[in-house]
Amino acid sequence: MADFDQELDASGLNCPLPILRAKKTLNAMSSGQVLHVIATDPGSVKDFDAFAKQTGNELMESKEEGGKFHFLIKKS
């Protein structure tokens, strides 16, 4: 996993809550900073891909590890 500036643990939350929390966190971050999101909802894989495309942010990494999904999102 690459370096990141902030981490959001959305484990146990069902969509759309991980997306909404990520959006709120990203809004407080500066352009170019990276957010690491941890989620347990399998639907979050598609959701974060679509979220990045809709918002213009870059989904740098998306992987599953130990039953958790990890996303690195770079704020545009």
Swiss-Prot record:
Keywords: Cytoplasm, Disulfide bond. The active site is at 15 (cysteine persulfide intermediate). CDD domains: SirA_YedF_YeeD (cd00291). One of its GO terms (cellular component) is cytoplasm. It is found in: Cytoplasm. Belongs to the sulfur carrier protein TusA family. PANTHER family: SULFUR CARRIER PROTEIN YEDF-RELATED (PTHR33279:SF6). This is Sulfur carrier protein TusA. The gene is tusA.
